[in-house]
């Protein structure tokens, strides 16, 4: 595709089954195989291919996607999305005053398929996956980051809230050391 993502699928080919990881359920602190890699549901053709429920990607490919977003639609010097589309999709599409307090985006806005930072977190866009994965771009500090895990439910550990904070803290600490 135009972003150079060569390991992203709706159905993982048999040739790549060895690269899949097992997804685990966490029950009372014990990891139990939920979707073993060798017989994963992602080896089957989906009933309907859509990214929010079944797009499988490698960390390298996902990073290319984040790089493209951070470049406002440009990757490797080539425009693959209009800047307007990226800004619209990574901007808050919710009307002012919408209460998100009892949702999975509590305290944030919502873009085209992702969480949008507001207030002190303005300039961030990203999303967490069902199996604990989290990825985001931070336009203010021109940074992208991702963390890949394979456990469910995704809220077993506080990674979704803590990972972005840890990344920013490390960036700020690095700037102090460099100064």
Positions of PLM-derived features:
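Short, surface-exposed loop or secondary-structure junction motifs
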Residues: 1-122
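Structured C-terminal helix/loop/strand segments within mature extracytoplasmic catalytic/sensor domains
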Residues: 124-179
């Amino acid at each position: 595709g135009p972003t150079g993502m060569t390991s992203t699928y709706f159905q993982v080919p048999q040739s790549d089954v060895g690269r899949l990881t097992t997804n685990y359920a966490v029950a009372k602190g014990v990891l139990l195989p939920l979707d073993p890699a060798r017989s994963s549901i992602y080896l089957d053709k989906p009933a309907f291919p859509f990214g929010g429920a079944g797009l499988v990607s490698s960390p390298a490919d996902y990073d290319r996607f984040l790089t493209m977003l951070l470049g406002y639609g440009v990757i490797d010097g080539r425009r693959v999305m209009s800047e307007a589309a990226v800004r619209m999709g990574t901007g808050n599409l919710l009307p002012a005053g919408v209460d998100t307090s009892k949702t999975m985006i509590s305290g944030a806005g919502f873009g085209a398929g992702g969480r949008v930072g507001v207030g002190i977190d303005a300039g961030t866009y990203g999303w967490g996956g069902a199996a604990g994965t989290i990825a985001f771009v931070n336009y203010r500090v021109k940074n992208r980051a991702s963390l890949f895990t394979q456990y469910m439910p995704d809220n077993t550990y506080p990674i979704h809230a803590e990972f972005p904070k840890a990344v920013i803290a490390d960036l700020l600490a690095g700037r102090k050391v460099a100064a």
